[in-house]
Amino acid sequence: MYRALTRDIEVVVEPFYLEEQSDPEDDRYVWGYRIVISNNSGVAVRLVNRYWNITDQNGVVDEVTGPGVVGEQPRLSPGDTYEYSSGCPLDTPSGLMFGHYQMETDEGELFDVDIPAFSLDSPGLLRVLN
């Protein structure tokens, strides 16, 4: 698992290889990832936007931005957690992802919360990140 903490908001990522959706002979490698966001701060926040940097083993970068996550813009009161799962296809057997969520307080303050960098490694390959 990979963790990042920004302003007492913790993001934990657990990636996993989806062998049944992958086809290495056609250069298709697919990973899922589970993310848990915990609001350990004293203020409520809403996840309004996301930014992802997805880099394959050849250094090809895909930047993804958009509102919320998986069609939602969850509000987390102090002590709340929010969990979701998603996925990422690559044309190479490994890569990495990192990014941030843009959060908004009830008072309208916007700030970024880091998503830790994490490896996307096919089974049998050495891990890129620990």
UniProtKB/Swiss-Prot annotation:
Out of the domains of life, which is the source? Bacteria
Q: Which residues form a coiled coil?
A: none
UniProt xrefs under Gene3D superfamilies:
ApaG domain (2.60.40.1470)
User: Which biological process terms from the Gene Ontology are attached to this UniProt entry?
Assistant: error-free translesion synthesis
- Pfam families in the cross-refs: DUF525 (PF04379)
Show the stretches that span the lipid bilayer.
Answer: none
Domain ApaG, which positions? 3-127
Give the SUPFAM superfamilies listed for this entry.
ApaG-like
Fetch the PANTHER family from UniProt.
Answer: F-BOX ONLY PROTEIN 3 (PTHR14289), POLYMERASE DELTA-INTERACTING PROTEIN 2 (PTHR14289:SF16)
Q: Which NCBIfam families does the record match to this protein?
A: PRK05461.1 (NF003967)
The name on file for this protein is Protein ApaG
